[in-house]
């Protein structure tokens, strides 16, 4: 029942929220948000298990699939979309599914999250296989859409994780790995787009970023597989080459073009004094890891 969930409780600090000044509201929201990272810290060992599982799936050619309803679903779609330009992966490698489909990203779709079968159907549409990793996201921890999807994923042998913001969440029983970030009562009662949503976003950031490090998408702390889809990212790409190799802007630009705008390739060309094809071949041998390539 909803009344038994911490995310649905009334926050004693904000009982008279409508009487507070804007400054007072901002201060109490800031104070409440400060506890989110502490709640996440308690679950880091479980989040690490998810990262290890996702990385293993990627190495097998599998995909990461986020799945949720409402805010939770939107956060999964957002993180999946950001992985494409940030890490240069295809839009099929990290997928975000939301109950009700794409139109639910901007407006609510009545009844979509209450369907057990809809989650299963959405996974069937993307041809889920056992090498994929499915993460179900639900602040309440009880969304039928997510439960149905997790059950189907486990049925076909895919690894699963559940991320919720309540202790002993219902979805935890339907996943291999359970992350329960207990963020407590919201400033605005029941509005889980607030602390719960913030916690979920931070955890998804951790999972996608750390998993991408694990498959060679990062050199030092540089996004060397960035996809330069606009002028800003083109300039960032050149700055990354400069930072990684200690060359000037003109040299970085020259190798950037010679590498056909592949930052990682340009870096290896410079650091190993090699031509493009040789750099590509050596990167392939090192499974895409720049550090391993240049240390050979």
Swiss-Prot record:
Transmembrane helix is among the record's keywords: no
Pathway annotation: Amino-sugar metabolism; N-acetylmuramate degradation
SIS domain mapped to chain residues: 54-217
EC number: 4.2.1.126
InterPro entries given in the database record: Etherase_MurQ (IPR005488), Glucokinase_regulatory_CS (IPR005486), MURQ/GCKR (IPR040190), SIS_dom (IPR001347), SIS_dom_sf (IPR046348)
Domain of life, source organism: Bacteria
GO terms classed as biological process: amino sugar catabolic process; N-acetylmuramic acid catabolic process; peptidoglycan turnover
Enzyme class: lyase
Catalytic residues of the enzyme: 82 (proton donor), 113
Keyword tRNA-binding in record: no
CDD domains on file: SIS_Etherase
Catalytic activity: N-acetyl-D-muramate 6-phosphate + H2O = N-acetyl-D-glucosamine 6-phosphate + (R)-lactate
Keywords of the record: Carbohydrate metabolism, Lyase
Family: Belongs to the GCKR-like family. MurNAc-6-P etherase subfamily.
Subunit: Homodimer.
Further comment found in the protein's record: A lyase-type mechanism (elimination/hydration) is suggested for the cleavage of the lactyl ether bond of MurNAc 6-phosphate, with the formation of an alpha,beta-unsaturated aldehyde intermediate with (E)-stereochemistry, followed by the syn addition of water to give product.
UniProt function note: Specifically catalyzes the cleavage of the D-lactyl ether substituent of MurNAc 6-phosphate, producing GlcNAc 6-phosphate and D-lactate.
HAMAP family from the UniProt entry: MurQ (MF_00068)
Name assigned to this protein: N-acetylmuramic acid 6-phosphate etherase
């Amino acid at each position: 029942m909803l009344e038994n969930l911490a995310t649905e409780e009334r926050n004693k600090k904000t009982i008279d929220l409508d009487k507070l000044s804007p400054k007072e509201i901002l201060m109490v929201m800031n104070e409440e948000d400060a506890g989110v990272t502490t709640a996440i810290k308690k679950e880091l060992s479980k989040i690490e298990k998810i990262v290890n599982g996702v990385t293993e799936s990627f190495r097998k050619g599998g995909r990461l699939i986020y799945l949720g309803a409402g805010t939770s679903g939107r956060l999964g779609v957002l993180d999946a979309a950001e992985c494409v330009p940030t890490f240069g992966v295809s839009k099929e490698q990290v997928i975000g599914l939301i109950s009700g489909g794409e139109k639910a990203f901007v407006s609510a779709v009545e009844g979509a999250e209450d369907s057990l079968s809809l989650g299963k159907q959405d996974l069937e549409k993307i041809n889920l296989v056992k090498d994929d990793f499915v993460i179900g996201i639900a602040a309440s921890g009880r969304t039928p859409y997510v439960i149905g999807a997790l059950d189907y994923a486990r049925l076909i042998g895919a690894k699963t994780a559940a991320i919720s913001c309540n202790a002993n969440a219902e979805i935890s029983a339907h996943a291999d790995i359970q992350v329960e970030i207990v963020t407590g009562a919201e400033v605005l009662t029941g509005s889980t787009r607030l602390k719960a949503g913030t916690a979920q976003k931070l955890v998804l950031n951790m999972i996608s970023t750390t998993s991408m490090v694990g498959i060679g998408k990062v050199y030092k702390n540089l996004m060397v597989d960035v996809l330069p889809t606009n002028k800003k990212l083109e300039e960032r790409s050149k700055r990354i080459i400069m930072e990684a190799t200690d060359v000037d802007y003109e040299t970085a630009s020259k190798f950037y073009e010679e590498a056909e705008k592949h930052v990682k390739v340009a870096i290896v060309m410079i650091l190993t004094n090699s031509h493009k094809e040789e750099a590509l071949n050596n990167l392939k041998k090192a499974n895409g890891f720049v550090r391993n390539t240049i240390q050979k």
